[in-house]
Amino acid sequence: MRILVLAFLWAGTCLGQFPEDAVILETSEKGETLLLAGKERELDVPREPASTFKTVIAWAALDRGLVKDIEAPLPGAEGDNLRLALQKSLNPPFDLLAVELGGEVLGGYAGRSGLIQGEIPKRWMEGKEKEARHGADLMTTIRREHQVAVAWMMGRPPWDGPAGQKLQEALLWKGAEKPIRAKTGTYGGSVWVTGYGPEKAVTVWLPGGLPRRPEALKIFFGRWEIPVPNP
């Protein structure tokens, strides 16, 4: 992924558009990637994927037939379907799915997804079943998170199969004014919003915790000049 840094940051931090501690990547449908905020050295620092890992759990569950209908109520989600469980980042349904899939199977999907940095230990989930929702001890980087979002946008393998296509529909934020597919994550000192919509893929990373989630969402949806939708 070739990164173009905005020399004068005319679209970024010098005008106060983005927080000083934000890292923001944006890639056009033509494949041009801009670093709108932050330093390039931040892109490859290992970080916890937080709840962005739930996309891997959802993909594996769809591919294995554990979830057949993304609009049907999902066990453990108190009546919500897979789409809303992803959007609200509910924990219980993904805990159940992770246990049903098992560490070896889920680790295989994690490796194929491109999200996780380094080799995935065979017993990565052993004794950490309730931490699988955020990848347990597995690590990602801002660059990898964004590359996955770009792969979603471009329909590149492994996301071009039936399960990958269903996942893309499950990631749709139906309340948004434009067709945006995204996933949030907040854990381990990272706040993520990553996904894609018309003409671009965007990844927003902020340091911190849950209180900064609304801020990250505002930046993300602001790249399409629309408000943050309600679930």
Question: Where do the model's predicted regions map?
Answer:
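Structured C-terminal helix/loop/strand segments within mature extracytoplasmic catalytic/sensor domains
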Residues: 42, 99-105, 148, 153-231
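Short, well-structured active-site flanking segments
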Residues: 53, 62-79, 158-164
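Second-shell loop/turn segments in exported
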Residues: 40-48, 72-84, 91-100, 129-137, ...
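Sec/Tat-exported extracytoplasmic proteins
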Residues: 56-66, 86-90, 97-105, 109-119, ...
